[in-house]
Amino acid sequence: MLSCRLQCALAALSIVLALGGVTGAPSDPRLRQFLQKSLAAAAGKQELAKYFLAELLSEPNQTENDALEPEDLSQAAEQDEMRLELQRSANSNPAMAPRERKAGCKNFFWKTFTSC
C-alpha cells in the first residue's frame, strides 16, 4: 500500500515538473522579432522568407559550437556546408518561366510551350 502511494506521488510530481518545464521554456527572440517585422511590413512572402532565413543563418548557435569534441568537427563542417547551400539557394533567382528561358524556343504542344 505504501509503495503504491509512493509511486502515485512520484508520478504526480513528475507531471507537475514536466508542465512547469514546458511553461518556463524560453522563446526564441529572433522568431518573435521576425514575427513582429512580418506583421508590420507589407512585403511579399518570398522576401520575408529570404530575410528570415538569412537572419537565422547569420547568427550561428555559439553554445553548440563551444561544446564540440574533435570527432564532432566533421559534423560541424557538414552543417557549415549546408548553411552555405541554404544561403546560395535563398539568394538565387527564382525559376524563370519557360518563355523567358530561351527567346527563340518555338516548340509547343497544344497551346503550351515546352522547355527546349
Curated annotation (Swiss-Prot):
One of its GO terms (cellular component) is GABA-ergic synapse. The keyword Signal applies. C-terminal amidation of the neuronostatin peptide is required for its biological activity, including for the regulation of mean arterial pressure. Residues 62-99 are annotated as: Disordered. It is found in: Secreted. Residues 25-88 form a propeptide. The keyword Amino-acid biosynthesis does not apply. The modification Alanine amide is found at residue 43. Keywords: Amidation, Cleavage on pair of basic residues, Disulfide bond, Hormone, Secreted, Signal. GO terms for biological process: regulation of cell migration; regulation of postsynaptic membrane neurotransmitter receptor levels; somatostatin signaling pathway. Disulfide bonds join 105-116. One of its GO terms (molecular function) is hormone activity. It comes from the Eukaryota. InterPro entries: Somatostatin, Somatostatin/Cortistatin_C. Residues 1-24 form the signal peptide. Belongs to the somatostatin family. This is Somatostatin. The gene is SST.
